[in-house]
Amino acid sequence: MTEARQALTGKMRLNARFRRVAAALLGLCVLPLGVLASASNTVASKTPTRMGSPVIADMKPKSGISVYWVGHSLVETKAQSEWGEITLMSLVGRFAHARGLGYRMGDHTLWGSPMSALWRGKPHGYTRDASSMVPKREQFEATAGQYDTLVLTEALPVHAALKGEYSSYYLRRFYCALKSANPSSRVYLYQTWVNLQGADPYSKFPPAHRFDWRAEMVAQRKDWEELAAQGARAQVREPGWFARLGWATKSNGGCDIEDPIYIIPAGQAMVALWDRLKAPQSTDDFAMPDGSRLTLADLFANPYENWPSDWPLSAEAEDIDPAAIVARLKPRDASRGHDDIHLSALGIYFVALVHFATLYGQSPVGLPVPSMVGEGVARTLQCLVWQVVSSDPKSGVTAQETC
């Protein structure tokens, strides 16, 4: 994930320099309006057209999906469990098969990559050779008609990727590749999360003792909604020299279709779990089989132990040296590096519940339970996930049934 965050801040500064160059060029010449108009839609579209404002429609429960996954390590993270090695993608399939539902998948993932690198073989904001992704993308374009579902996610932080990596444009390119081949397909944006303990230096989080994970999650939800809305429009900001010089040229991304892009609210489910852990309902069970009480940190691969329970401190609190305190903390597994962004086996289980509920439009209550979770905790998590998914207006799922 970190490579995708490097140089994005510097990229923004370079854009300002390009705009100054643009101002100088405008003093020398004036581009005819026809030239700019011709540059505004450079991806030819011979595909079906369905124009209009995207409307989030309710989804009837599905009996099977053929899904193509596009993303980075928060899609492909692996963990060991009693079921063997699991990933998000494999666990969604396990859940589906347990219900007698169809599940077929393909994937196009690369650790730490924004959608730009997955489409064009290199990112815009930093140097990385991802050329091996181009043949995979071309293969997807050639076989897209085999899929009825597309799940994509973006590198973090999303607000920086929107500007420096032209996220909406590349989301649109993948969207059009699928929609042109299968107009009845559905496209989903997988909303992820920020570092639980604020360990990402490229997101410019406040110092650790002031870092408010929940507030950051709530604030960043709008970035995901903005990306989904932009990708569903037939006019998106196109990368290239015009964009670098400050001219917002537009492209349809390969089609004029404007069906909605739905959101898989994994990040929102984590926020809901955060809240319920602090204020449990009478039916909640957070007692883990090993005798401990579930914490949000249990969802992550290797967070710090003994994170100060009174953080974040209020603005009025006496200032301290957070770096010195964090330096004394140890990750749960001292033999490995601190990791507060990737998922543990329990985290993969939780996020897979969110994906199953959203993609199939079905309650996850009653899905298989690993012994590490236990029946009581599993039912609490399954009920919470269904409440989040079925009440999120961007998920495309609504239901009257409750736990």
Task: Go through the PLM ranges and name each one.
Residues 1-17:
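N-terminal secretory signal peptides that target proteins for export/translocation
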Residues 24-33:
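Bacterial N-terminal signal peptides
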Residues 35-47:
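Signal peptide processing junction and immediate N-terminal pro/mature segment
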Residues 102-120, 268-271:
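Short connector loops at secondary-structure junctions
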Residues 123-141:
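Glycine-rich, highly charged phosphate/nucleotide-binding loops
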Residues 136-341, 345:
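Alpha-helical cap/lid subdomain in secreted, periplasmic
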Residues 365, 369-403:
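A cross-kingdom marker for long, charged
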